[in-house]
């Protein structure tokens, strides 16, 4: 293999590794996994120095710079895909039903979720408001289950910053 092609390929692959680790490390930091984030940053910096030195030592070849830039973009995509798979943390899902249905909270509880419900008033009458805490990795599954039960439900999710007490207390502790 030609040395120039080998350097371009190496820069590309090493930068994908660097940015993937960077993306995951950033998400670990935001989720509060400080020691795991610190450990990953060590590997991130080693890989970064290798990739950057390869580019800086070979700046006369535009393909090296392009490999670095494209590897950066691909690394972000790969890092985000990994984060979606591990889906760290929890989400709070708020549901406003189309109609007031006393059985709905129990149907969702039967699926294994903790549910708090209360009467709400909408423009067109009484609604039920539900608040559900679940792991992020279950978010899509929960959305599908809610829509199967109430196709007209309004669903909004957000990430809680702190959790204390309630249905999940034993499972949420880090």
Curated annotation (Swiss-Prot):
Subcellular location: Cell membrane
Domain of life: Bacteria
InterPro entries hit by this protein: DUF2179, DUF5698, UPF0316
Gene Ontology CC, one term: plasma membrane
Keywords: Cell membrane, Membrane, Transmembrane, Transmembrane helix
One Pfam family in the UniProt entry: DUF5698
Coiled-coil parts of chain: none
Bilayer disposition of the protein: Multi-pass membrane protein
SS bonds (residue pairs): none
Main location: membrane
Residue ranges crossing the lipid bilayer per the database entry: 4-24, 36-56, 62-82
Family label: Belongs to the UPF0316 family.
PANTHER family xref list: UPF0316 PROTEIN YEBE
Protein name in UniProt: UPF0316 protein lin1888
Species assigned in the record: Listeria innocua serovar 6a (strain ATCC BAA-680 / CLIP 11262)
Source organism phylogeny: Bacteria, Bacillati, Bacillota, Bacilli, Bacillales
């Amino acid at each position: 293999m030609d040395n120039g092609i080998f350097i371009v390929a190496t820069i590309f692959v090493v930068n994908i590794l660097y940015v993937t680790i960077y993306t995951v490390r950033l998400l670990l930091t935001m989720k509060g996994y400080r020691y795991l984030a610190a450990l990953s940053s060590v590997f991130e910096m080693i890989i970064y120095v290798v990739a950057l030195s390869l580019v800086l030592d070979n700046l006369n070849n535009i393909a090296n710079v392009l490999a670095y830039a494209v590897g950066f973009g691909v690394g972000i995509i790969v890092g985000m895909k990994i984060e979606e798979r591990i889906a760290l943390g929890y989400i709070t899902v708020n549901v406003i039903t189309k109609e007031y249905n006393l059985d709905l909270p129990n149907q969702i509880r039967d699926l294994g979720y903790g549910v708090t419900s209360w009467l709400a008033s909408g423009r067109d009458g009484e609604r039920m408001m539900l608040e559900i805490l679940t792991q992020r990795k279950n978010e899509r599954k929960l959305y599908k289950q809610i829509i199967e039960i109430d196709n007209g439900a309004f669903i909004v999710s957000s990430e809680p910053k702190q959790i204390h007490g309630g249905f999940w207390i034993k499972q949420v502790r880090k």
